[in-house]
Amino acid sequence: MDIIEKRITKRHLSESELSGVNYYNCIFERIQLDNFNFRDCEFEKCRFVNCSIKNLKLNFFKLIDCEFKDCLLQGVNAADIMFPCTFSLVNCDLRFVDFISLRLQKSIFLSCRFRDCLFEETDLRKSDFTGSEFNNTEFRHSDLSHCDFSMTEGLDINPEINRILSIKIPQEAGLKILKRMGVVVGG
């Protein structure tokens, strides 16, 4: 079933499953999804605004050119999203979200708050994290080349297990990287 150019607002769905539905150019506002299962679904060019999305199960799920603004994403394993996967997150809270083995080049994560998140074996080249906060969030074996981490807080990147060619980082994060490398900056 295809759903095109619909505005869906103020819904609370929990402990349910949606199968075989494709959304195109839809807007979701103030939607709450808890313990929801998406099977063989696709969202393309959709916007999610002020939504709460917790503990999703994703099977044969596609997310293409979607935007999340002012949303809470919690307990989501983004590794279950099929390729291609393109999205932007603006002013979102992410808790216990795993980005594993994904190709997310040129993704946008502006002014987001990451808590207990993991980026592992993920290609994030040329992604923009400007203004984001990181709390207990790890990057492991990921390509961060040409990423912009300007004005971020709490960023801690291990250069021994990540590719960090030409990245923009705040001074605090740069000092942490130098310390890991055994370089002491004094003055």
Curated annotation (Swiss-Prot):
Pfam family, one: Pentapeptide
InterPro entries: 5peptide_repeat (IPR001646), Pentapeptide-BTB/POZ_domain (IPR051082)
Highest taxon, organism lineage: Bacteria
Keywords associated with the record: Antibiotic resistance, Plasmid
GO biological-process terms attached to the record: response to antibiotic
Signal peptide annotation: none
Entry similarity comment: Belongs to the pentapeptide repeat protein family.
Stated role: Together with proteins McbE and McbF this protein causes immunity to the peptide antibiotic microcin B17 (MccB17), which inhibits DNA replication in Enterobacteriaceae by induction of the SOS repair system. McbG alone can provide some protection.
Name used for this protein in its record: Protein McbG
Species this chain originates from: Escherichia coli
Gene: mcbG
